[in-house]
Amino acid sequence: MRWSQCYIPTLKEAPGDAELLSHKLLIRAGMIRKLTSGIYTWLPLGLKTLNKAISIIRSEMNRIGAEEILMPMVQPADLWKESGRWDQYGKELLRIKDRHDREYCLGPTHEEVVTHLLRGEVRSYRQLPINVYQIQTKFRDEIRPRFGLMRAREFLMKDAYSFDQDNEGADISYHTMFDAYKAIFTCMALDFRAVEADSGSIGGNFSHEFMVIADSGEDTIAFCRKCDWAANIEHAATLPPQTKALTLEKSMEEVVTPGQHTIKAVSTFLTIPEQQIIKTILYTIDNKPVAVLVRGDREVNEVKVKNMLDATVITMATPEQVHQWTGAPVGFAGPVGFTAGPIIADHELMVYNDWVVGANKPDKHILHVDLARDVQNITFADIRLITDADGCPSCGREIALTKGIEVGHVFKLGTKYSKSMNAFFLDENGEEQLMVMGCYGIGVSRVIAACIEQNNDKYGIIFPPPLAPFEIMLINLDPRDESVVMKASEIYQFFLSEGIEVFLDDREERPGIKFNDADLLGFPIQVIIGAKSLANGIIEVKNRKTGEKSSFSLERFFTDFYSWRDTVYVTWGLS
């Protein structure tokens, strides 16, 4: 491919509404253009990159025996009402009506459609297992679509669905897909981690996320420095207490704390550490009041609370609700005498018995509180966010936190959808059984953005070879010099004959512009030829990832290039 024959509208500056680095670089590199909020057009170079990701994914799906299908993007409301998600999914589900006033939605996912498909086709256990996948456009009506492809409303996704006779078979399907995802992201040369995760709106009882490590990631990942344990911070378990506190001999004491409505203020006012204070946070959970307790220096993990109660909606109480339930303003709520609803305390609070809590009265706290002695209707559970001061829940060793971008998610759904949608088969005894399902997604367009978030520098994108639009940028510095044009054409034809994807910059532009664009586009290898180097009998090459340059003699270029190219692949962990 020659630049003079291509449409690549590069920009010196990104638009003002582009926030995330990948968004800025994709626009500057002429790979995407915004149509409207959260919806983008893929331009030729960007589409070539997207197709690279699709090819890797499709190859691995086919290798494990998954069969490709294509389901409709427009889905009838009846299926979503049957599964119960029509009302649960919320405003992210874009609902439409046809001319006959029938309700539909634009599919954000396809569990209902694929379950409906196979419940009408599968009759016998002999037809199972089945594993199908598609690569198709999805739509989620995000309230504030931001960050370009990272949180778009319309996006490309690979979603796969497995159907098995029993849990044992479902486990095999799950782990087969789990290993396939590891192979996919390894093939893409991405630095990633597979982490334990919450199943969210998809449902199910077991899931893993695949996270690309990047400082700009929205998700926080906890991982062990010694063993293989890793989890999304929302799902990361904390170690249970090894001991429990003895009953406190001191009696409770109410004290005046005027205007001290934060943990820090109470700590300073009473000259006690924040770790001795209990933070009481009130929630409305499925329209019922619940008090949640954590240590003063800790944070509540709302996902854990929601899962513990098997709840659908969790929201923090308003100041008016806090006053209604406790008789006190925000900052003075506490568990002693709280009767508006159940109390859930983090299990860490069992190891100590001399707490300071809000008194449920304005400007007052209570000292010397023993939760086991002084609080009724209390349940202890793991409900806090893990920190890097905690031990690994698997081996007890040191953990660390890092940021990541979710690019894939695998779920063991069980019978959530097959039960609600009556997806039965006849077992070997002729009895009806529910199909056991799994679902597995990769955000294909998101992979490209995540790749760029992980691989960039101040000059532009640094594509790993498997995802680069072209492997080689061949730069002709003197397109008006016939000898340079001929040598560049010779090298260009050589790469094409070897099956190497090469892009020839044959524009009549200044060398500085060509170098800047080459770095912006981020192809892994740059091959540079100009009148000066040609006169000296050399050709220059550059590893875009490391910035290292080398020179080869004209006579030995075609033989020496391959060994040098191997070193470029090694820098990406590829062979």
Curated annotation (Swiss-Prot):
All disulfide bonds of the chain are: none
What are the entry keywords? Answer: Aminoacyl-tRNA synthetase, ATP-binding, Cytoplasm, Ligase, Nucleotide-binding, Protein biosynthesis
Q: Superkingdom, according to UniProt?
A: Bacteria
- Keyword Nucleotide-binding appears in the UniProt entry: yes
Query: Entry's PROSITE patterns?
Result: AA_TRNA_LIGASE_II
Catalysed reaction per UniProt?
Answer: tRNA(Pro) + L-proline + ATP = L-prolyl-tRNA(Pro) + AMP + diphosphate
GO annotation, cellular component aspect: cytosol
Cell compartment(s), UniProt: Cytoplasm
Xref: Gene3D superfamilies: Anticodon-binding domain, Bira Bifunctional Protein, Domain 2
Q: Which SUPFAM superfamilies does this chain map to?
A: Class II aaRS ABD-related, Class II aaRS and biotin synthetases, YbaK/ProRS associated domain
Q: Which GO terms describe its biological process?
A: prolyl-tRNA aminoacylation
Chief localization: cytoplasm
Q: What is its EC number?
A: 6.1.1.15
Which residue spans adopt a coiled-coil conformation according to this UniProt entry?
A: none
RNA-binding in keyword set: no
Molecular function (GO) terms listed? Answer: aminoacyl-tRNA deacylase activity; ATP binding; proline-tRNA ligase activity
InterPro entries to which the protein is assigned, alphabetical: aa-tRNA-synt_IIb (IPR002314), aa-tRNA-synth_II (IPR006195), aa-tRNA-synth_II/BPL/LPL (IPR045864), Anticodon-bd (IPR004154), Anticodon-bd_dom_sf (IPR036621), Pro-tRNA-ligase_IIa (IPR002316), Pro-tRNA-synth_IIa_bac-type (IPR004500), Pro-tRNA-Synthase_IIa_type1 (IPR023717)
Query: Pfam families in the record, alphabetically?
Result: HGTP_anticodon, tRNA-synt_2b, tRNA_edit
- What interactions and quaternary structure are annotated? Homodimer.
- What is the purpose of this protein? Catalyzes the attachment of proline to tRNA(Pro) in a two-step reaction: proline is first activated by ATP to form Pro-AMP and then transferred to the acceptor end of tRNA(Pro). As ProRS can inadvertently accommodate and process non-cognate amino acids such as alanine and cysteine, to avoid such errors it has two additional distinct editing activities against alanine. One activity is designated as 'pretransfer' editing and involves the tRNA(Pro)-independent hydrolysis of activated Ala-AMP.
Domain comment quoted from the record: Consists of three domains: the N-terminal catalytic domain, the editing domain and the C-terminal anticodon-binding domain.
**Similarity comment: family membership:** Belongs to the class-II aminoacyl-tRNA synthetase family. ProS type 1 subfamily.
Q: Which NCBIfam families match?
A: PRK09194.1, proS_fam_II
What protein name is recorded for this chain? Proline--tRNA ligase
Q: Give the species.
A: Lawsonia intracellularis (strain PHE/MN1-00)
